[in-house]
């Protein structure tokens, strides 16, 4: 599914988890990720495919897990919108995170809103 590009591995792990919970934690680096300008997540709002991936599993989430997921997706969306100069949408997403997220994400979101304000002041 082309829509899920960038989130397809997440989809695979969720489907495996429906079959078994026999996962082991390996405290060792097994691979590396190369960050470059042409990677999919730079050019795409990754909250969209991630939202699509989890929709089939939402019935398994409790209220707090659903809220935590929404916070994560809004933070991802906010960053994408900031980078693509959609300031109003980014501010809306970051405000949701500030109202509902954990302190680390609240602070990051506040910083992003400050950057948006400073960027808008600089443009005027």
Regions found by a protein language model. Give the residues of each.
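Inter-repeat boundary and helix-capping residues of tandem alpha-helical solenoids
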Residues: 6, 67-68, 103
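Membrane-interface aromatic/basic loop that binds lipid-linked glycans or pyrophosphate carriers
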Residues: 78-124
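Secondary-structure boundary motif
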Residues: 18, 59-63, 99, 103
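A ubiquitous short alpha-helical element
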Residues: 38, 60-64, 79
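N-terminal alpha-helical segment
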Residues: 71-74, 90
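Alpha-helical elements of Rossmann-like donor-binding domains used by nucleotide-donor carbohydrate transfer enzymes
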Residues: 11-15, 49-53, 76-77, 92, ...
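C-terminal, non-catalytic tails of nucleotide-sugar-dependent glycosyltransferases
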Residues: 22-23, 47-72, 123-124
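Conserved nucleotide-sugar donor-binding catalytic segment
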Residues: 1-47
